[in-house]
A protein has these predicted regions:
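Extreme N-terminal starter segment of soluble prokaryotic enzymes
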Residues: 1-4
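Glycine- and acidic-residue-enriched helix-capping/strand-helix junction motifs
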Residues: 14-28
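Short beta->alpha junction loops
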Residues: 46-54
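Short acidic active-site motifs
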Residues: 55-59
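Short acidic/histidine-rich motifs immediately flanking catalytic phosphotransfer sites
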Residues: 63-70
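Helix-loop-strand module that forms the ligand-binding subsite of alpha/beta enzymes
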Residues: 72-110
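Short, glycine-/small-residue-rich phosphate/pyrophosphate-handling segment
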Residues: 96, 105-147
């Protein structure tokens, strides 16, 4: 089983960007955490990060036929990108949305998630642990769907 894990804009600045919200661990630590969580779950992961909406859309499209599912933290594009929503719907791979912070308790403009409309589940406010939960959930979801 293989998952594409997508991280959107500014996540490459973890540790620098608003540590009171996102924590002090940097992006390399997050990548290591995701790899370890995938290994523990017995799944393969491909990691992708971009600050560019079109590159994220391209990565989602490229996952068709090469990945079994997607874990996505679209970051700021969560609240603005119909293009990412449409790409997720087009490839029709099961996807799980992750947010480090609890976006439901933040600014009003963060209350809508376009990407979440195409996802089977969302984890928010769990920090890095949200990625582990997403990987485990997606594995279980696929196992049950293929049973």
């Amino acid at each position: 089983m293989k998952f594409l894990v997508i991280n959107g804009p500014n996540l490459n600045l973890l540790g620098l960007r608003e540590p009171a919200i996102y924590g002090s661990r940097d992006f390399a630590v997050l990548q290591d955490f995701i790899r370890a969580a995938a290994h523990e779950a017995g799944v393969e992961v491909e990691l992708f990060q971009s600050n560019h909406e079109g590159a994220i859309v391209d990565a989602i499209q490229a996952a068709y036929g090469t990945a079994d599912g997607i874990v996505i933290n679209p970051a700021a594009y969560t609240h603005t990108s119909v293009a990412i929503l449409d790409a997720l719907k087009a490839v029709a791979l099961p996807a799980v949305e992750v947010h480090l912070s609890d976006v439901s308790t933040r600014e009003p403009f963060r209350q809508i998630s376009y990407a979440g409309m195409a996802c089977v589940k969302t984890y928010m406010g769990l920090g890095f642990e949200g990625y582990r939960q997403a990987i485990l959930y997606l594995r279980q979801y696929l196992e049950e769907a293929n049973a």
